[in-house]
């Protein structure tokens, strides 16, 4: 997928309708007149809403200010957590995506590209990786660092709750480190799942101290120092059309990573199927009615 093909694959993040590419290739316009700009380095500004919700705007500002020192700060956090092996753990995350050469992957919240580099390695040769972030400065830094040898790489500024792609576009989607602060988290999970083909993988993680550690002295200190570690794993936000859900605690059990496989539809339960071997009708529905 070259740059022109990437632009042609983008849809309106609000409506999902097609976009018209200007002759000079510098803008994309929706049917209702909303314009999205293509930057000089090819980064497409697909942010929606144009004026971000307060929480998302705050995160964008913070990351834009911290982009040069961000990697050192994150590595320090992981080092404090049971002296975790950051490189090995990040590789473990990407392995969960089950990528192969030639596949197409999306990373939401790519940051400076640490995990992105591992994703690129997995789909080489011939694969396509699309990287997005809220922060222009973070994404520009990733673009400067990452090698495009034997792989197609495309970048866009985007809100993970409004992805500019058609259904079933990717083989896998990855996000780590920001879902706790998403203003529309449930919608984000719906979007991350929607753009993955049936059978593909979604891998998501962030801060959340494991329940069995929260009352221990050391972790109680951690919870006071950074309220984000108090976040609960957002299992309730996961869509219905998934299977093989797994949850792992990592980085000293202070972060989680979840993985699941996308299905074409939600599972079904036949609550009216009669229980065999009885001389009277019995099923789940009747048992529920009796329990009321």
Question: Where does each model-flagged region fall?
Answer:
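Conserved class I S-adenosyl-L-methionine
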Residues: 8, 47-98, 114, 118, 201-226, ...
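Class I SAM-dependent methyltransferase SAM/SAH-binding core
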Residues: 104-162
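N-terminal, positively charged/glycine-rich alpha-helical extensions of SAM-dependent methyltransferases
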Residues: 25-72, 282-292
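Short alpha-helix
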Residues: 225-245, 256
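A short acidic, Gly/Pro-enriched loop at the edge of an enzyme's catalytic core
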Residues: 161-172
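A short SAM/SAH-binding and catalytic strip from SAM-dependent methyltransferases
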Residues: 171-184
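A short glycine-rich, Lys/Arg-flanked "PGG" loop and its adjoining helix->strand segment in the class I
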Residues: 186-198
């Amino acid at each position: 997928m070259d740059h022109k093909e990437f632009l042609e694959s983008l849809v309106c993040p609000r409506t999902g309708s097609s976009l018209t590419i200007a002759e000079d290739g510098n803008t994309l316009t929706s049917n209702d007149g909303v314009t999205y700009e293509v930057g000089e380095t090819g980064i497409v500004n697909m942010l929606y809403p144009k004026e971000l919700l307060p929480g998302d705007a705050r995160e964008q500002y913070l990351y834009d200010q911290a982009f040069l020192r961000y990697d050192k700060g994150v590595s320090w956090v992981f080092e404090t957590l049971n002296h975790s092996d950051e490189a090995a753990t990040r590789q473990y995350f990407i392995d969960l995506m089950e990528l192969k050469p030639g596949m197409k992957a999306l990373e939401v919240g790519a940051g400076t590209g640490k995990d992105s580099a591992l994703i690129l390695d997995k789909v080489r040769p011939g694969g396509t990786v699309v990287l997005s972030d809220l922060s222009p400065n973070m994404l520009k830094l990733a673009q400067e660092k990452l090698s495009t040898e034997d792989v197609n790489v495309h970048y866009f500024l985007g809100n993970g709750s409004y992805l500019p792609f058609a259904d079933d576009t990717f083989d896998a989607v990855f996000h780590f480190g920001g879902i706790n602060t998403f203003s529309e988290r449930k919608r984000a999970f719906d979007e991350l799942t929607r753009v993955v083909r049936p059978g593909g993988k979604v891998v998501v993680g962030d801060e959340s101290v494991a329940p069995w550690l929260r009352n221990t002295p050391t972790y109680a200190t951690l919870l006071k120092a950074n309220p984000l570690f108090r976040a609960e794993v957002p299992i309730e936000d996961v869509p219905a059309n998934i299977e093989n859900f797994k949850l792992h605690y990592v980085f000293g059990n202070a972060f989680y990573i979840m993985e699941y496989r996308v299905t074409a539809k939600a599972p079904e339960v036949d609550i009216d199927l009669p229980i065999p071997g009885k001389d009277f009708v019995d099923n789940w529905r009747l048992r529920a009615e009796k329990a009321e």
